[in-house]
Amino acid sequence: MKGNEILALLDEPACEHNHKQKSGCSAPKPGATAGGCAFDGAQITLLPIADVAHLVHGPIGCAGSSWDNRGSASSGPTLNRLGFTTDLNEQDVIMGRGERRLFHAVRHIVTRYHPAAVFIYNTCVPAMEGDDLEAVCQAAQTATGVPVIAIDAAGFYGSKNLGNRLAGDVMVKQVIGQREPAPWPESTLFAPEQRHDIGLIGEFNIAGEFWHIQPLLDELGIRVLGSLSGDGRFAEIQTMHRAQANMLVCSRALINVARALEQRYGTPWFEGSFYGIRATSDALRQLAALLGDDDLRQRTEALIAREEQAAELALQPWREQLRGRKALLYTGGVKSWSVVSALQDLGMTVVATGTRKSTEEDKQRIRELMGEEAVMLEEG
């Protein structure tokens, strides 16, 4: 990865603060990668893609860096729960055997596990050695007939957030747009003009949380072409260029993907959340608006009215117990404001919220929810 390519990812045009006098994301401070390096960010972003073999090229310690710590659930394959590594040691470094070990590792994985694709994550040691990941990937792909993709995000490149963007950049350039989506099933109850395809970016299906939202989209005739990357499938992500709209769920991680897809394919996008009643209703309304279907807007409003009424009844006993209680959130990123909204729906008062990985846009949302004097915890 060249230095100018890294700087380009840090200078994100879609960030509002990028248009101020001082543009670009802040450079990492010494010790910042203790909270997650670029490799960690790349792996945690793509690991939920369930039918891909995720191979860490480096010492075995790197393989455990962020394996499965997001808790993303899969409705099908579980290949992503297997940890693969080339386990480089001192002798491999001295003798220059890294590339050969990597090639044989890919061939072994494909022969034994039959993945939809193999993602190879670069780490500090082979990056400093100068291993040619692209050449090995091309040779392995030719030998196996399976897509082999290099994720060049060695830890010393920068922060965890940079790793998120590096991983997303690879998906845009090498994966998305490589396949056409399957036709809608003949058994669908929706007329052709009522069918809509969307993409989800930065949605990780933590503990299966998105499965509570999926039935609402199904009822509206909205198909999720691909999710980057919760409960994701490699072939589905390849079709995301055909989405009519994209929803960005975690802006800090993959805002560059939403912006790039808009530039390349003209796909409109918005940032939203499925945490809390108000946020979920707003997200559904924004989706319907972006899709530009008046009939869908009407059906969306009817669904929201029905579901909000049901939620109000279900939450009433809890509101009686929780109303006026104080809560302190120590989360970060998109959850620094989205969970505030959910707790306020229960009548609770949020006295402070963590903003360790939050953007300026996230902080503005916090102020809108908690007031201009909102207490934000930057460090912890």
What does each model-identified segment do?
Residues M1-G380:
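An N-terminal assembly and electron-transfer interface module characteristic of large anaerobic redox
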